[in-house]
Amino acid sequence: MNANIRLLKYIVGVSSALFLIFSLISLFETIQNEKLYERDICFDSQCLKFFAEKTSGIVMYFQAFGWLITTFVTVFGVMIALMTYNAGVKNNNNSNYTSHLTMFREFASAELTKRSSIYPEKVNFFRWYRVMFPEAQGGDISVSRDYLEIISRIKCVIEEANAHITEENKDYKYKTHQRKMMAVLDEIGISISNGPKNIFIEVESQILDYIDTINLSFCHSSSVIELSRVKRKYI
């Protein structure tokens, strides 16, 4: 900001100096051409009026220059004010972003310790946060549509497995289900490995509950799905 003020002073100073030089040259030529130097020096009203008439062009230049400088300084001042405001907003957004991200990370980390089947190194909090709040650095902490769609796809993976369960047939192709669940969870930074059916179901149960806990705390949207309430016929 100091650099902008220095630039303003420099422009005004240089412009004023150039205009002063131009005015002095114009005044000198006017005196020469009108032979004003041959007249006696006097300061009565008639003399001053006569001199003003002869140098009226220079006076108009001064008036125009004054108007231009005033306009320029006003416009430049408004620009500096806007830049100051934008810088303040940006700094405030950065501060809010950092605070919100820290709160998210600390809360998610604390909740993760309550779930023994999920390994901490398998959860990327920063990726999860970026998917959930892609515009957070700009001050917008609204939950993204992409994130809500991912949550919806997790539900679809569960329902697809449910569709294979019947009274006669309990086989839901659990390996295919595991691959699909792993793929969709990876989109929000949660990485899990495939494994025996019962162990995977336990891990999946804790993850769904974990996601719900985060969503209930940070997603103020009526459209978010509570995954742990989705019936899973295969458990």
Swiss-Prot record:
Biological processes, Gene Ontology terms: defense response to virus
Name listed for the protein in its UniProt record: Retron Ec48 transmembrane protein
UniProt key word Cell inner membrane: yes
NCBIfam families: retron_Ec48_2TM
UniProtKB keywords: Antiviral defense, Cell inner membrane, Cell membrane, Membrane, Transmembrane, Transmembrane helix
Protein's job: Membrane component of antiviral defense system Retron Ec48, composed of a non-coding RNA (ncRNA), a reverse transcriptase (RT) and this membrane protein. Expression of this retron confers protection against bacteriophages lambda, T2, T4, T5 and T7. At multiplicity of infection (MOI) of 0.02 cultures grow normally when infected with lambda without collapsing, at MOI 2 cultures enter growth stasis. At MOI 3 cell membranes are permeabilized within 15 minutes of infection but do not lyse, suggesting the phage are not able to finish a replication cycle.
Cell inner membrane listed as a keyword: yes
Protein's organism: Escherichia coli
Transmembrane intervals: 11-31, 64-84
Comment field on protein domains: The N-terminal transmembrane region is required for protection against bacteriophage infection.
